[in-house]
Amino acid sequence: MKLDKQVWILAGGRLLLQFGTGFTLFYAPLFFVNQLGFSPTMVGIALGSASISGIVGRFLGGSWSDSPSWGRKKVLLLSAAISCLADVFLAGTYDYNTLLIGNLLMGLGIGFYWPPAEAMVADLTTRDQRNFAFALSRLGDSIGLGFGVAFGGVLIAVTGSYRLLFVIDGISFLVFYAIIYGAISDSGQKVLEKQTFWQGWGKTVKDYNLWIFCVVNVMFTTYVMQIQTTLPLYFTNFAVNPDDFTITRISSLFSLHIAFAAVFQLPIVKVINRLTHIQGLILSFLFWGVGFILIWWAGNSPDFAFLIAILAVLISAIALATYNPTASGFIVDLAPPSLRGIYFAINSQCWAIGNLIGPPLGGFVLDSGASYAHNFWLFSSASVFCGILILFILQNNINDGELTIDN
């Protein structure tokens, strides 16, 4: 499919950005808990604190992305600069206050990133191109993250230095800044309208369908955070057969998870293009439900636990690959072009809320003991039926014409 070259450049930039993130994402909880001695709950709170500043970043980033005086590009540059500063603090963490400051800054930087990044893809594509374009962006995320996790595991094995991972992450943000500065023009100038800061938000908050969607979106993002932050500690500390889950194996497992997401990201577009956005999200929920059951099985199995875990991350990767372009495409259909930044800000606020809920929830469950840790995955699997019910309600609202989607 022929796309604007800037879409490809953005995908390449995201690959680089996620390569740096992969160095830290799965190893940060292990570093802070097992080497610095913080409890899982304390680390969960610190990681979750990024969501507080992330809410501020998304709120401002969405509005500024829709402002002719700011635009998408300037907000992306601000995001990269703040995120690089965050890694300076995280690389130098020895006490809990520094850990909190680093995570608050990282949350702010990432908060600024998502609204303009997603809005740019929408600006540069047609409706027929968007599922593929959003999938391509997520493919860049997955490939970069996968290589980052893999090389991070090798780097830890060779050097034993977790702090070096944060240094490399900071360098990736600097390179990303250079790419955006030199190779990307501001895509939103043709569609942006002059309006006060609050006018755009006033129009957006009246979209009832958007708020219904946000409920299920928070569920999805909480699921993702359980895979990213809770699962490494669960397999490390609670698996019935801990020999199957060494640090090297966990590194390989999560590299496979991201590799699976990359492999299936573009092929899954052929499936979701035949479905409505609601149907695509229901399909994702079903995959998540199966994946959580397999995680429970892997944690409780005395034999073949690692093989079951591979199957679990395969299914959860397909769930993620199904969710990402479908959710972004649904937001584009809801949003007027001049308000895409704000709509994507609200969409990405769901990630902030998921980040706020997910790590502390997972940390609390793991602190509560083995039985709670094991059963948590079964409760997570059962929760998908609540999400599917909400999606049926949303579909009925659309079918009844209570609110229309601008195609």
Regions found by a protein language model. Give the residues of each.
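Cytoplasmic helix-loop-helix junction between adjacent transmembrane helices
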Residues: 104-141
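A membrane-interface helix-boundary motif in multi-pass transporters
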Residues: 157-171, 366-384
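C-terminal membrane-cytosol helix-exit motif in multi-pass small-molecule transporters
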Residues: 171-189, 390-395
